[in-house]
Swiss-Prot record:
Name of the protein this chain belongs to: Zygotic DNA replication licensing factor mcm3
Described function: Acts as a component of the mcm2-7 complex (mcm complex) which is the putative replicative helicase essential for 'once per cell cycle' DNA replication initiation and elongation in eukaryotic cells. The active ATPase sites in the mcm2-7 ring are formed through the interaction surfaces of two neighboring subunits such that a critical structure of a conserved arginine finger motif is provided in trans relative to the ATP-binding site of the Walker A box of the adjacent subunit. The six ATPase active sites, however, are likely to contribute differentially to the complex helicase activity.
Main location, first listed in the record: nucleus
Keywords: ATP-binding, Cell cycle, Chromosome, DNA replication, DNA-binding, Helicase, Hydrolase, Nucleotide-binding, Nucleus
Domain annotation MCM: ranges: 295-502
Motif annotated as Arginine finger, chain positions: 477-480
Keyword Acetylation found: no
Originating species: Xenopus laevis (African clawed frog)
Organism lineage string: Eukaryota, Metazoa, Chordata, Craniata, Vertebrata
Bias kind Basic and acidic residues: ranges: 693-702
Length: 806
């Protein structure tokens, strides 16, 4: 037995010497010597070693390390400590241990949780998966120091368990007495502890076989590896595979629990902060200066280029990705800078595709669905820890997306209780939990991009937007912009969409030949921690524009160049850093337009609001103006930014409503009807208006006058509503009062109410006010006819010669 132990020690010393030779490569390229010096300067104690370098220099030792990991890693770490001591002796004494992390090509040992079988026990493996669960970080004792007051001596004891690399676990009991039964005092300040965390990673859904549930494996993280990952991250974990015996009734059972003791964790998810070179920044600066007039149009057009149309929605999503400026006042009040957008519309209008594009573009984005997530799943949940049985908090999607975007699809399918759970997050940017003895406040400063279908499945144009949307005002007011996306029957528009979609389906990437069958399975798996193709791509210079492809981009137009996604991502990242300040001109414009928005539909008869205009709408205008200024990389918010924000808001806030066709008796002969049908379109509309005016029917506030007898084709307003009102003609004009005169009367009456600063005005005062400075004054008959019409439309009420504004 002694001979075997001596042989093991000799082998260990031999392995340690070979590893030391590998690290001391000053005569060769000096890679690892410089790495160790960098590690010392950064105050780290884990060295990342590429297994390919060890394989190239000492193939036998690399093979032994891969297949007999525990002894190999212990020898490697001892060699590292000796090498650090030879470079900097004082630094080597600061830490109890130095650690080795591995990377490189693992070949057959590059596995998923499903293919991690018993033949890999005691080997180094690389496992890919998605982190599903993270435990709390707890301290674990490594060495305890005890002092005996009677003998004035100190005793040290080291502790190891089955999650350590050492072969034999030690006793976990603290000594309380020495050999002579003298009591001992534990010196906690001199004892050494290490951080300890358990995570669970699950097989990636794209790697799992069809029709089978993904499998998972437990990972042990120690020291500097703790808190490197969070739930939802895609990771590669390199470590040693070990089994832990489980006891039943005092006896070790034949079934074992397996764990992976990690020595390195590599993130596979996209980087939150892209890497910038000086050339990249120069290109971004040059682009913003050379396209100073149309930079907003250019960027929004390059957003989701595979989706045709929806230009206003793309502009809103661009503003959402940039966000406004968050303000925290001295008294603790927080004014949010995140922009929330809600898309409501018919099926198949590319709502989910827009959400998916944001997931690929935004630096941090978390996807959820309405039925697949609960209120606590979105905010935070109180769960029971499996190891200790304690209650603890688990972060939900919105907490994980802090400073990012949450994309919620099928928003209308969520229950009301779950929807109310996100009220606080959307306005305050935090989650407050007070349950099960836990009171906590978590940051959730994220933008919300939600997509929903209308109440009736499809949008009913004969009902108001509020009836179609079916969400509470308290929730709608928290969305900065609400877009109604309609699937309209327009032959020209349908032709453009079909041409665009067919081109997408005909497109093939550069490596494919025409006529070749596309592979059904996934691409070839790279059995290494680094993809060699990715490194070559990173060395290429940043392309500002996508290379033009006739199938992807259609007929080449000089002005319609599409920016590359990588350039978009970097441009957005740089633009977000700016914090523009409102100028006086922009501030006064926003204040004036906000008051106009509040009074917009008092006199308008053909549009309805999609969401309530509250004080939050004023903040919306400020946030959108700031985002537009960020696109220009400006330090101030100018008037043009405020005008662009107003255009977006007016497009999103107002929606036209149709009135269903009413069956009326024919009051004219058959010959008149035939005459009408043969009339040109414009004359026919005039005649219908005239006939309706003679009938003197009551006028509905949400009524279209010129589309009563036709199939409704409703377009969402693309110009500010003020312009639309001027184009509309009122069909309810009585004989002797034209539509223009009625409109002029309404405008004059509204001005009179504003001047009086009151909700009621006497008839005599009203007559004087509307005819003051008027080139064509209103007669008594005209005023009477106009008041009757407005009273029928529920705009005003006349009583005792006093006009009341309703």
């Amino acid at each position: 037995m002694a001979a075997v132990t001596e042989l093991d020690d000799q082998e260990m010393r031999e392995a340690q010497r070979e590893y030391l030779d590998f690290l001391d490569d000053e005569e060769d390229q000096g890679i690892y010597q410089s790495k160790v010096r960098d590690m010392i300067s950064e105050n780290q104690y884990r060295l990342i070693v590429n297994i390919n370098d060890l394989r190239r220099k000492n193939e036998k030792r690399a093979s032994l390390l891969m297949n007999n990991a525990f002894e190999g890693l212990i020898a490697f770490q001892r060699a590292l400590k000796d090498f650090v001591a030879s470079i900097d002796g004082t630094y080597a004494k600061q830490y109890e241990d130095f650690y080795i992390g591995l990377e490189g090509s693992f070949g057959s040992k590059h596995v998923t949780p499903r293919t991690l079988t018993s033949r890999f026990l005691s080997s180094v493996v690389c496992v890919e998966g998605i982190v599903t669960k993270c435990s709390l970080v707890r301290p674990k004792v490594v060495r305890s120091v005890h002092y005996c007051p009677a003998t004035k001596k100190t005793i040290e004891r080291k502790y190891t368990d089955l999650t350590s690399l050492e072969a034999f676990p030690s006793s976990a009991v603290y000594p309380t007495k020495d050999e002579e039964n003298n009591p001992l005092e534990t010196e906690y300040g001199l004892s050494i502890y290490k951080d300890h965390q358990t995570i669970t990673i699950q097989e990636m859904p794209e790697k799992a076989p069809a029709g089978q549930l993904p499998r998972s494996v437990d990972i042990i993280l120690d020291d500097d590896l703790v808190d490197k990952v969070k739930p939802g991250d895609r990771v590669q974990v390199i470590g040693t595979y070990r089994c832990l015996p489980s006891k039943q009734n005092g006896y070790t059972s034949a079934s074992f629990r397996t764990i992976l003791i990690a020595c390195n964790v590599i993130q596979m998810s996209k980087e939150v902060t892209p890497v910038f070179s000086a050339d990249d920044l120069a290109k971004i600066k040059k682009f913003s200066k050379s396209h100073s007039k149309d930079v907003f149009e250019q960027l929004s057009r390059s957003l989701a280029p595979s989706i045709h149309g929806h230009s206003y929605i793309k502009k809103a999503i661009l503003c959402m990705l940039l966000g406004g400026v968050e303000k925290v006042l001295d008294n603790g009040t927080r004014i949010r800078g995140d922009i929330n957008v809600l898309l409501i519309g018919d099926p198949s209008v590319a709502k989910s595709q827009l959400l998916r594009y944001v997931l690929f573009t935004a630096p941090r984005a978390i996807p959820t669905t309405g039925r697949g997530s609960s209120g606590v799943g979105l905010t935070a949940a109180v769960t029971t820890d499996q190891e200790t049985g304690e209650r603890r908090l688990e972060a939900g999607a919105m907490v994980l997306a802090d400073r990012g975007v949450v994309c919620i699809d099928e928003f209308d399918k969520m229950s009301d209780m779950d929807r109310t759970a996100i009220h606080e997050v959307m306005e305050q940017g935090r989650v407050t939990i007070a349950k099960a003895g836990i009171h906590a406040r978590l940051n959730a400063r994220c933008s919300v991009l939600a997509a929903a279908n209308p109440v009736y499945g499809r949008y009913d144009q004969y009902k108001t937007p509020m009836e179609n949307i079916g969400l509470q005002d308290s929730l709608l007011s928290r969305f900065d912009l609400l877009f109604i996306m309609l699937d309209q029957m327009d032959p020209e528009h349908d032709r453009e969409i079909s041409d665009h979609v067919l081109r997408m389906h005909r497109y093939r990437s550069a490596g494919e030949q025409d006529g070749d069958a596309l592979p059904l399975g996934s691409a070839v798996d790279i059995l290494a921690t680094e993809d060699p193709n990715v490194t070559s791509e990173e060395q290429q210079e940043l392309q500002v524009y996508e290379k033009h492809d006739s199938l992807l981009h259609g007929v080449k137009k000089r002005r319609e160049k599409v920016l590359s996604m990588e350039f978009m991502r970097k441009y957005i990242h740089v633009a977000k850093i700016f914090k523009p300040v409102l100028t006086q001109e922009a501030a006064s414009f926003i204040a004036e337009e906000y008051t106009r928005l509040r009074n917009q539909d008092q006199m308008s008869t053909d549009v309805a609001r999609t969401s309530p205009v509250t004080a939050r709408s004023l903040e919306t205008l400020i946030r959108l103006s700031t985002a537009h200024a960020k696109v220009r990389m400006s330090k101030t918010v100018q008037l043009q930014d405020a005008e662009a924000a107003l255009e977006l808001v007016q497009y999103a806030y107002f929606k036209k409503v149709l009135e269903k066709e009413k069956k009326r008796r024919r009051r004219e002969g058959e010959s008149d009807t035939e005459e009408e049908q043969t009339q040109p379109d414009g004359e026919g509309k005039k005649r219908r208006k005239k006939r309706r005016a003679q009938d003197g029917e009551s006028h509905d506030p949400y009524e279209f006058s010129d589309t009563e007898d036709e199939t409704p084709v409703v377009h969402t307003p693309k110009t500010p509503v003020n312009g639309q009102e001027e184009m509309e003609t009122d069909s309810s004009a009585k004989p002797g009062l034209s539509g223009d005169r009625l409109k002029a009367f309404k405008s004059a009456l509204l001005d009179a109410f504003k001047a009086a600063h009151a909700q009621s005005i006497a008839m005599a005062a009203m007559m004087e006010a509307i005819n003051k400075n008027n080139d064509s004054p209103f007669s008594q008959a005209e005023v009477k006819a106009a008041l009757e019409l407005m009273e029928e439309a529920n705009h005003i009420m006349v009583s005792d010669n006093i006009v009341f504004l309703i």
